[in-house]
Amino acid sequence: MESKVKYGQEIGINLIKIAKKLLDNQDLCKLLVNTDLDPLNPNTHPNNIDGISLLHKNIRVVPLVTAEDQTTESKIVLLLDEGGVNRSNSDNENLSLLINIYCPFKEWSITGDTLRPFAIMSEIRKSIQDKRINGLGEIVYRGFNVSTLTEEMGSYMMRFAINAFS
């Protein structure tokens, strides 16, 4: 039987799996949608957020962030930017995952000793760094850099490497 990964058929499915793994993180969801200074405060935000309701809204796999999106809640965009056949096993594919974090400047400051974009990046790493998701090998964190700065928002790009299994 031919490998589905070898022909890219499972790549989109795996991207959705990663997005859903991020949606399981309540602190990440709260950082994305609670736009006040204390987004994790259980007294002001006592309820859990239905993570799946944020798919394609705050956590996206379609790399589109409009001008309107730049002034509202923070967004995460997942993008596989590169893939290649694993040299030691041609049924596996080495993937490069980019996660872009878009945060309006008016939401950067939060209570505590950090800024919202870095709190979001920390929760992303807690969710997927060195983890395995069904059909994927270990997700390895490679680093981050500033991606975009506009008058309304700033964006950071995180890089991960993944070995996708057949």
Language-model segment annotations:
Residues 86-88, 105-109, 166:
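Residue-level signal for secondary-structure boundary sites
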Residues 115-166:
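Acidic-leaning, charged glycine-interspersed low-complexity segments
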Residues 42, 49, 65-77, 105-125, ...:
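Acidic, Ser/Thr- and Gly-enriched intrinsically disordered low-complexity segments
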Residues 75, 94-96, 155-159:
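Extracellular structured ligand-interaction cores
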